[in-house]
């Protein structure tokens, strides 16, 4: 079964480049920043399972998940 997800985007609007395909600690950390618990490297970019469109941009994810009130 295909799991839904998205490629998250960094502060410049680019996907996160990765070189170690599959299980990838860097991508897992990135996906956590974007509010989901799991991701991996697919096709040279971090892919996050269950990442919703509203959290694809790191700016949106930060607004949605960071507890720091600055900028709200």
UniProtKB/Swiss-Prot annotation:
Which ranges carry the LCN-type CS-alpha/beta domain? 4-67
Where in the chain are disulfide-linked cysteines found? 18-41, 27-46, 31-48
Where would one find coiled-coil regions in this protein? Answer: none
- Protein name listed in UniProt: Toxin Acra II-3
Keyword Nuclease set for record? no
Q: Which InterPro entries match?
A: LCN-type_CS_alpha_beta_dom, Scorpion_toxin-like_sf, Scorpion_toxinL/defensin
Q: What is the lineage of its organism?
A: Eukaryota, Metazoa, Ecdysozoa, Arthropoda, Chelicerata
Keyword check for S-adenosyl-L-methionine: no
Q: Which domain of life is it from?
A: Eukaryota
Which species is listed as the source?
Androctonus crassicauda (Arabian fat-tailed scorpion)
**Record GO cellular component, one term:** extracellular region
Copy the domain comment. Answer: Has the structural arrangement of an alpha-helix connected to antiparallel beta-sheets by disulfide bonds (CS-alpha/beta).
GO MF annotation, one: toxin activity
Q: What does this protein do?
A: Binds to sodium channels (Nav) and affects the channel activation process.
By its UniProt entry, which Pfam families does this protein fall under?
Answer: Toxin_3
Location(s), subcellular: Secreted
**In which family does this protein belong, per the annotation?**
Belongs to the long (3 C-C) scorpion toxin superfamily. Sodium channel inhibitor family. Beta subfamily.
Summarize tissue expression: Expressed by the venom gland.
Keywords tagged on the record: Disulfide bond, Ion channel impairing toxin, Neurotoxin, Secreted, Toxin, Voltage-gated sodium channel impairing toxin
């Amino acid at each position: 079964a295909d799991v839904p997800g998205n490629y998250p985007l960094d502060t410049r609007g680019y996907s996160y480049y990765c070189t170690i395909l599959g299980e990838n600690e860097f991508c897992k950390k990135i996906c956590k920043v974007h509010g989901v618990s799991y991701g991996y490297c697919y096709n040279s970019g971090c892919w996050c399972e269950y990442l919703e469109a509203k959290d694809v941009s790191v700016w949106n994810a930060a607004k949605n998940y960071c507890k720091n009130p600055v900028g709200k």
